[in-house]
Structure formats: structure tokens, C-alpha cells
Design a protein with these regions (language model features):
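Beta-rich, blade/repeat-based domains predominating
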Residues: 2, 121-133, 167-186, 214-232, ...
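A short helix->beta-strand "capping" segment at the edge of beta-propeller domains
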Residues: 97-124
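Beta-strand-rich domains and repeat architectures in extracellular enzymes and scaffolds
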Residues: 114-146
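Residue position within the beta-strands of beta-propeller blades
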Residues: 138-139, 183-185, 234-235, 297, ...
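Blade-loop segments of beta-propeller domains
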Residues: 142, 148-189, 210-213
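Short loop/turn segments that connect beta-strands within beta-propeller blades
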Residues: 156-160, 198-203, 266-271, 309-313
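Asp-box/WD-like beta-propeller blade repeats and closely related beta-sheet repeat scaffolds
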Residues: 187-227, 235-242, 246-251
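Conserved small/polar residues in nucleotide/adenosyl-binding loops
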Residues: 387-388
């Protein structure tokens, strides 16, 4: 049976009236469920975003709190380390020495012409030089730190250079006696030592003579001189620790100004050690007059050179029988030398530090500099020249 167009349209109308409401209801329910699902997903996303934001804010807050606590802790540690940490040599209040007075001293220009220089090979530096029998002797060293340093006593005639002896640590000074033996001041991490060395064409033998005083190790030995009578004068820069070398001990004494440097005399005849003069703020150099009667001592912190009778004992720097030969020097004096005419040569380890002497009455600032370490301390002092 064939269905005509009208019948087909009637069937569609009846089907739409019968099924249409159900389809519409199904679509409506599906759309509502979809909307509810979308709304729930949106709420979950919003809740997740809010939770993440809250966690992020909490983390940032904790980080800021931790950063603040860490910063305050670092600040407190820094304040303690620079201002309150105990140190072996607490700074003392002192009166800064006057500026240089007119003493007739002349600045000596040193030529840099290669013809006037003595080459010592691959050594990194020189601590002390002397002339003996037409040869130049130098205490030359290798090694940046005292623990790894090795020092040689090198002899040269301007051409060939040869090491005649070698010691561990720092060879801070040496001098010859009438017999040609060499007296050495040696500094290691264990302390200072006064040594005697005998040398010939076969080699050298080094003997330790003085290693301690009153049961305590020698401190930072800095210089040695031998009198015509054979007595050996040697200086201990200060009570500052010697484990980092002489230069460190002298810088420490400059900042602390403890006045604990001593000059001693050793008599080989009876092997006795006596104190000559104390109260020196950095005993850094010695010299004897040609007749051996007058002893000169460099006082680093007071920027002066003391003179005294070489036979005197138990003196105090600046006290009775200890006069100032030169005061108000332009730098901090180190090694001394006297020629045959009695002219005194003064070398300077550093130029005068205006900051240091401006704070002579401030133990706080100098204490901070002492605790701050080597790099800052080195910036407070600059190299200086040679005066006669």
C-alpha cells in the first residue's frame, strides 16, 4: 500500500505530538545535568584556584618570615663576630704619637735600574738582607702561608746565587758573629726560635738555641743582632699569636697596641737569657752601634726608635734610661741598620694610618678591625719608604 504525502505528514504530526514532549523533556534534563556539571566543575576550579592562592600566600608568608629570621640571625652573628667575639689580643686605649718632627732625616731614593738589582731566582720574596765579606746574604722564601713556607739563606755576589741553608717557616732575621756563625730568628706555626748555624763549603748545620722563655714558647721573633762581644740580641714583636706569620702579628699589634713586645739578650758564654727592654708596641727591628754600646729598637705602634745602653736590663720603653732617638716618624718603622759612620737607616713596613691613630681611644672600632680579618686589615695600611 502506498502512502501519500498527506498520510506521511499526518504520521509525522502524530509522532511529534506523541514523542516530541518526551524528547524535549530528555533534552531539557540533559542540558540541566550538563549545566550542573559545568557549574560544579567551575566551582571545583575556583576552589582549587583559591586553595592554590591560599597555599601560595602561606608559602610566601613563611618564606618572608624565614627570610626575616635568617636575616636577623645573620645580623646578630655578624654583630657578635665583629663586636663581641672574644679575641686573643683585645685592643687597648693609647695616645696616638705626634706627627713627624724635623729630625734631619732624609728620604732615600732606591733605584729600580736592573743593573742595581740582585736577582734571586724563583723566590717569592725577601725578609732580611745583610752584607758580609763582600757577599750579600738574603733570607728568601717560597710559600704563601706560614704552614707551607720554606725559607733559605741565599748568598750572592751579584751574579750567581746559592742557598747555604734552609729552614721551615719564616726566617725573620739573621746576623753574623765574629766567628762567622749565623744567628737566625725562625718563626713557625709552633712559635719562634733563636738558632745558630755553622756553615762551610760542605754545608750548614742549624742548632736551636732558645725555643721558650719561662716555660712558654717564644712568640713572633722579628729581628736579631750580635754585639762585638758576642752577645745575641733578639726581639719578640708582641704577645700576639705567631701562627700566621710575623706580618700578621705586627698588624695585630698595630691594631691592638698591647705594648707586649720585648727585646732579649742571649749570652753564649753562660747560655743565659735576660730581658733588655719591654713595653714595646711591636718590636720590629734592632741595630747596634759599631762599638756595641748602644742598642736601637724599632717601636712599630709608637712610630719611634728607642735607644738605650746595650748593657742595660729590665728597661721599659719610654721609661728611665730608654730614650727616643727618633719620634713622630712618617710610618711604622721596621728593620734598622747602622753604617760605619753611625748613620741609622730606618725602613718602614707601612705608612702611617690616619684612621688607626684617629681611633686610638676607640677600642670598639679597632676591635672590629681585629675581628674582620686579614683582607680588611691590609687595606688600612700601605707600603712606605726608607729614611736615614
Amino acid at each position: 500500500m502506498r502512502i501519500g504525502l498527506i498520510e506521511f505528514l499526518l504520521i509525522l504530526a502524530i509522532a511529534s505530538l506523541t514523542v516530541g514532549p518526551r524528547v524535549a523533556l530528555f533534552v531539557d534534563r540533559w542540558m540541566r545535568r550538563a549545566n550542573r556539571a559545568n557549574a560544579m566543575a567551575a566551582r571545583r576550579r575556583a576552589e582549587y584556584a583559591a586553595q592554590m592562592a591560599a597555599e601560595r600566600d602561606a608559602m610566601l608568608k613563611r618564606f618572608r618570615t624565614a627570610s626575616t629570621v635568617f636575616g636577623v640571625g645573620i645580623l646578630l652573628v655578624l654583630v657578635y663576630a665583629l663586636g663581641f667575639r672574644p679575641i686573643d689580643t683585645p685592643p687597648q686605649i693609647y695616645k696616638a704619637p705626634d706627627l713627624r718632627q724635623e729630625t734631619g732625616a732624609l728620604q732615600t731614593a732606591v733605584s729600580t735600574d736592573r743593573k742595581t738589582r740582585l736577582e734571586l731566582g724563583e723566590y717569592q720574596g725577601v725578609d732580611c738582607i745583610r752584607e758580609q765579606d763582600g757577599f750579600v746574604y738574603a733570607a728568601a722564601y717560597n710559600g704563601a702561608t706560614l704552614k707551607k713556607r720554606k725559607s733559605d739563606l741565599v748568598r750572592t755576589d751579584g751574579g750567581h746565587a746559592a742557598a747555604i741553608l734552609s729552614v721551615e717557616g719564616e726566617l725573620t732575621g739573621f746576623a753574623f758573629d765574629a766567628a762567622g756563625d749565623v744567628w737566625l730568628t725562625q718563626l713557625t706555626t709552633a712559635g719562634g726560635t733563636l738558632c745558630r748555624a755553622k756553615h762551610d763549603s760542605w754545608g750548614a748545620a742549624v742548632e736551636q738555641v732558645v725555643t721558650q722563655l719561662d716555660g712558654a714558647p717564644l712568640g713572633a721573633v722579628s729581628a736579631v743582632e750580635v754585639s762585638p762581644a758576642g752577645k745575641v740580641y733578639f726581639a719578640v714583636a708582641a704577645a700576639a699569636g705567631a701562627e700566621n706569620g710575623l706580618e700578621s702579628a705586627l698588624r695585630t699589634e698595630l691594631l691592638a697596641h698591647t705594648g707586649t713586645g720585648w727585646v732579649y739578650v742571649y749570652d753564649p758564654a753562660d747560655r743565659s737569657v735576660q730581658r733588655v727592654v719591654g713595653g714595646v708596641a711591636g718590636a720590629s727591628g734592632l741595630a747596634l752601634s759599631p762599638d756595641g754600646r748602644t742598642l736601637y729598637v724599632s717601636d712599630l705602634g709608637n712610630r719611634c726608635v728607642w735607644s738605650m745602653d746595650a748593657d742595660a736590663r729590665e728597661l721599659t720603653a719610654g721609661g728611665k734610661n730608654c730614650q727616643s732617638a727618633f719620634s713622630g716618624l712618617p710610618g711604622y718603622p721596621g728593620a734598622l741598620a747602622l753604617d760605619e759612620d753611625g748613620i741609622l737607616y730606618v725602613s718602614y713596613r707601612w705608612a702611617r694610618s690616619s684612621w688607626l691613630e684617629k681611633n686610638a681611644d676607640s677600642t670598639l672600632l679597632r676591635g672590629i678591625a681585629l675581628r674582620a680579618g686579614r683582607n680588611l686589615q691590609e687595606k688600612l695600611f700601605s707600603l712606605c719608604l726608607l729614611y736615614t
